[in-house]
């Protein structure tokens, strides 16, 4: 994972959800802070560990969740930031 790729994943996802303007990216730290309002603050952190990469999601006043993949992390983030949004899948075929 590069800082640019991290920024592309996070900013592209939040732009698709219509909330990109609420995000402050720290590419060098592989983290971002999303502030929708004073009660909805979420931090997303990407880390490389000896056993593999992990995504940490910290919601204000909630227990941190840890995910082994970007897909799982984005699903969890969607449930926090867009709980009423319909969930779908994209299938790429060749």
How would you describe each model-predicted region?
Residues 3, 11, 33, 48, ...:
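Generic N-terminal initiation segments characterized by hydrophobic and/or small/turn-forming residues
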Residues 1-37, 60-64, 91-94:
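Negatively charged, low-complexity tracts enriched in Asp/Glu with abundant Ser/Thr
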Residues 39-62:
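Short aromatic-glycine-(Arg/Gly/Cys) micro-motifs in beta-strand/loop hairpins
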């Amino acid at each position: 994972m590069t800082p640019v790729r991290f920024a592309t994943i996070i900013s592209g996802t939040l732009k698709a959800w219509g909330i990109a303007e609420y995000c402050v990216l720290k590419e060098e730290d592989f983290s971002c802070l999303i502030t929708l309002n004073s009660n909805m603050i979420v931090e997303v952190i990407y880390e490389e560990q000896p056993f593999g990469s992990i995504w940490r999601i910290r919601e204000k006043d909630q227990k941190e969740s840890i995910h082994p993949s970007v897909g799982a992390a984005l699903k969890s983030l969607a449930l926090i930031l867009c709980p009423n949004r319909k969930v779908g899948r994209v299938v790429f075929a060749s």
